[in-house]
Amino acid sequence: MAIRTILRYPDKRLREPTSPVTRFDAALESLVQDMAETMYAAPGVGLAAPQIGVLLHLFIIDVAMGEDQPSELRTFINPEILEAVGDVRNEEGCLSFPGVHEEIRRAERVRVRAQDAHGAFFELEADGLLAIAIQHEHDHLIGRLMVDHLSLLRRRLVHRAMVKRAAADTAVI
């Protein structure tokens, strides 16, 4: 297992399209383990493969992260949101936008169909933080980012702040 580098906005690779996972093998299991180690080290509640530069239709979530609950790591491979119901606003952060937290509108409940790390299909109905995390991570798989849910003004402000931070990070190296 290894901790991978998380791409930060405005890295263009975060917008690239992903491909379906077609091989369920030891390499995929290793990737999922690396993603989990990376997510927990960050720390975060979710991580999509494109956030570490892997353009596959895959994300992981553990909404118990940081709470007094046992870990409940979930792997979603080739996920498809079948149903999205209701409306909720919630403050979200993103590992690709360190330090940024914005109020985002999402569906209150979702039903998703995906595969696990062994290729078995499953369906899951989710609400609360899990539903929000599923939608957030699924967005990464289609090149949609947290800022895309913001007003044009907020998007520009966040963009400027992240570009400035990226320049400062580069100057330090």
Segments (PLM) and residue ranges:
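Positively charged
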Residues: 1-173
